[in-house]
């Protein structure tokens, strides 16, 4: 049976040190080879924490494959806004402001990993993460924007986004 190691690494900057080295060293794999593969597979997520699965297919032959997940929603929001972190005073001092277009872009990236039944619900999940990070949406409190979504204020925007999929 294949062994699986799951780690969170910075895109394009995995190193043989912790958490990778200690996790894959005991499996008998060439750590440098694994690190190089991970860096190649995650380079487009540079600066973001990315979930990675290392699947050891045959320990005797030392064969493995890498599966790269989608970064957490908070990482995608930070990347979209170009901010290093969320607000340390969420609710008082905004860390940034997302447009609905940016919310929908992030929701489209994450929808396959969410429990949301549609793009509207996925967008509301993204907005919930923005709220916890102290990020406003359309210059407003994220809770207000969630109510507006329920009221149909952004229906035209969602219809366009779903057509483009």
From Swiss-Prot:
GO terms for cellular component: large ribosomal subunit. One of its GO terms (molecular function) is structural constituent of ribosome. InterPro entries: Ribosomal_uL11, Ribosomal_uL11_C, Ribosomal_uL11_C_sf, Ribosomal_uL11_CS, Ribosomal_uL11_N, Ribosomal_uL11_N_sf. SUPFAM superfamilies: Ribosomal L11/L12e N-terminal domain, Ribosomal protein L11, C-terminal domain. The keyword Ribonucleoprotein applies. PROSITE patterns: RIBOSOMAL_L11 (PS00359). It comes from the Archaea. GO terms for biological process: translation. Keywords: Ribonucleoprotein, Ribosomal protein, RNA-binding, rRNA-binding. It holds the Pfam family Ribosomal_L11. Belongs to the universal ribosomal protein uL11 family. Forms part of the ribosomal stalk which helps the ribosome interact with GTP-bound translation factors. PANTHER family: 60S RIBOSOMAL PROTEIN L12, LARGE RIBOSOMAL SUBUNIT PROTEIN UL11M. Part of the ribosomal stalk of the 50S ribosomal subunit. Interacts with L10 and the large rRNA to form the base of the stalk. L10 forms an elongated spine to which L12 dimers bind in a sequential fashion forming a multimeric L10(L12)X complex. This is Large ribosomal subunit protein uL11. It comes from Thermococcus kodakarensis (strain ATCC BAA-918 / JCM 12380 / KOD1). The gene is rpl11.
